[in-house]
Amino acid sequence: MAVGKVKQIVGPTLDIEFPPGQLPNILNAIKIIDPKDQRELIAEVAMHLGDNQVRCIALSSTDGLVREAQAVDTEAPISIPVGSPTLGRLLNVLGQPIDEMGAIENAEISPIHKASPTFEEQDTQGVIFETGIKVIDLLCPYTKGGKVGLFGGAGVGKSVIVMELIHNIATHHGGYSVFCGIGERTREGNDLWLEMKESGILSKTSLVFGQMNEPPGARMRVGLTGLTMAEHFRDQEHQNVLLFIDNIFRFVQAGSEVSALLGRMPSAVGYQPTLASEIGSLQERITSTKHGSITSVQAIYVPADDYTDPAPASIFPHLDAATTLSRQIAELGIYPAVDPLNSSSRILDPHVLGEEHYQVARQVQKVLQRYKDLQDIIAILGIDELSEEDQLTVSRARRIQKFLSQPFFVAETFTGKKGRFVKLPDTIKGFKMIVEGEMDNIPEQAFYMVGTIEEVFEKAEQMK
């Protein structure tokens, strides 16, 4: 193993000199021993500078590190523990436990940098993945083994939907989940950990965190750490895995910080020039193979609610379904605040979902679109000036809008309402009854924050 010396430290970047002819490869992990307190720091080779020097990105804080510290080339990429021993555990980017529950024993070790599966190995079948959330299952259904984006600005409920999906998958599908927290609030990570413990779903989940307080190197690589764990469950244990990433935008942001530290010329809006290829290298590995599937749900922060920003715009093409959260809908008090007209799915197709589901979904969207078109007229002239047909459309649209809300299990403590998992046939039946006019005489308020259409009747009875 080649041994070098640290020559320069600038924030999270390190320049290390190695003996001639012993330069480490790019992406190799370098172990640096701090001579003062003997602590170990891992850095990753990012570029060769010439003169036998490499520039590395540190994956933990460089505070207190001194020049001339010894650096050892591990001759391999960052490698982490994978498999069953990681279930129920909380790890950092290097696969080290940060839950104070002792070391991870008897786990296989796997490098985080790998090639994506070849086209021959991939499996592309369109099967709906039932989430139990009405608005998602009806209007932007998720594909088993697909990639889903949760788009939304700050504070519209992305993380809550992610937590609800983890809950529903663990209780109704029984599969393994990997949760990857990239550059989000440490408090949210702690809340998630405690909630999972309480609800008893921790034993089916591995958690990997590289939060806001971590250096950019850790935030940039923690996505690959989580993905490597999910790939092991798929390929070696033949499981159907769920990979949750919160937030994929922070992965891009960390890449942008690293790019600036390495002195690369920024591209549009100050992002890194390698934006598309960085996202591609992560997304291409999230796929279904003949062994099993990885279904990924990625929360995507949209800077200043601008969907044309290069970061969300370069993530869009990789997705099978996009669930867009809207501030206007959140302001109406409708949660989950999913925008039914801007959310889309590749499998919203009669050949995949069946004719009934497709027709009901399209009718719901048609009614809501007409209601949206009439908003200006209603605001200026009032609802009484509309034709009878349009008045009926508006009253149905309002019922649909309220019925798209749903109490969540993970939000029980805030709402005081018991969570609901609504099966797909019940969802279709409920919305079909509304668009066909069977519910026109039921008061609007009865549709708010309920599960199935049967609950609407019960609530209407109580309101009398």
Swiss-Prot record:
The EC number(s) this enzyme carries: 7.1.2.2
Stored SMART domains: AAA
Function statement: Produces ATP from ADP in the presence of a proton gradient across the membrane. The catalytic sites are hosted primarily by the beta subunits.
Subunit structure: F-type ATPases have 2 components, CF(1) - the catalytic core - and CF(0) - the membrane proton channel. CF(1) has five subunits: alpha(3), beta(3), gamma(1), delta(1), epsilon(1). CF(0) has three main subunits: a(1), b(2) and c(9-12). The alpha and beta chains form an alternating ring which encloses part of the gamma chain. CF(1) is attached to CF(0) by a central stalk formed by the gamma and epsilon chains, while a peripheral stalk is formed by the delta and b chains.
Gene Ontology, cellular component aspect: plasma membrane; proton-transporting ATP synthase complex
Positions bound to ATP: G152, G153, A154, G155, V156, G157, K158, S159
Compartments reported by the entry: Cell membrane
Keywords: ATP synthesis, ATP-binding, Cell membrane, CF(1), Hydrogen ion transport, Ion transport, Membrane, Nucleotide-binding, Translocase, Transport
UniProt record similarity statement: Belongs to the ATPase alpha/beta chains family.
Record's protein name: ATP synthase subunit beta
EC top class named in words: translocase
InterPro entries cross-referenced by the UniProt entry: AAA+_ATPase, ATP-synt_VA_C, ATP_synth_F1_bsu, ATPase_a/bsu_AS, ATPase_alpha/beta_chains, ATPase_F1/V1/A1_a/bsu_N, ATPase_F1/V1/A1_a/bsu_N_sf, ATPase_F1/V1/A1_a/bsu_nucl-bd
Superkingdom assignment: Bacteria
Catalysis: reaction(s): ATP + H2O + 4 H(+)(in) = ADP + phosphate + 5 H(+)(out)
CDD domains named among the record's database cross-references: ATP-synt_F1_beta_C (cd18110), ATP-synt_F1_beta_N (cd18115), F1-ATPase_beta_CD (cd01133)
Single GO molecular function: ATP hydrolysis activity
Originating species: Protochlamydia amoebophila (strain UWE25)
Record membrane topology: Peripheral membrane protein
Major subcellular site: membrane
